[in-house]
Amino acid sequence: MKKILISLLAIVVLVGGIYFGSNLKPPKPTITIENNTVKVAQGSYCWRGLINAQCVDMISPPDIIKHHELKPVIVSPEAKLKIEFNRKPLENTLNASLWLSNGETENAPLNDNVLVVPKEKGVYIYSVSANWEKGSSGYVFVIGVK
């Protein structure tokens, strides 16, 4: 009987640790384009856990790219970029922005979590944001159109 109780307690602790550990930070997206996975850096976020909540304000997306030394994934003009999360964001909350050289941003239209990259050659920095029941989060990535 004692062994059963210890085993049950160990299972509860393990499951609880996995559950709470996986909910401490926002989910990270998987971004793919032309069979390549794009490296993504965490941007600003606010997230609520069971015990605490935190908001973290990050530097600008171009500075995040420099800080994390992210290299652009080289893609074809007008390639389709797919954004997926292991935990689905709230409906109609996924947004993308293209960062311009003057520090301004413009909306990057998404259709079913797919973004079409520009046809002009160049390096493009994008930020993506979404909301969940536990909070909101932003992410940054860079691509190069050849």
Model segments located where?
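Edge beta-strands of extracellular beta-sandwich domains
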Residues: 29, 136-146
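Hydrophobic membrane-insertion alpha-helices, especially the h-region
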Residues: 5-19
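Surface-exposed, short loops/turns at beta-strand junctions within beta-sandwich domains
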Residues: 115-125, 133
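Short beta-strand segments within Ig-like beta-sandwich modules, predominantly Fibronectin type-III
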Residues: 104-111
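N-terminal export/targeting and maturation segments
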Residues: 15-57
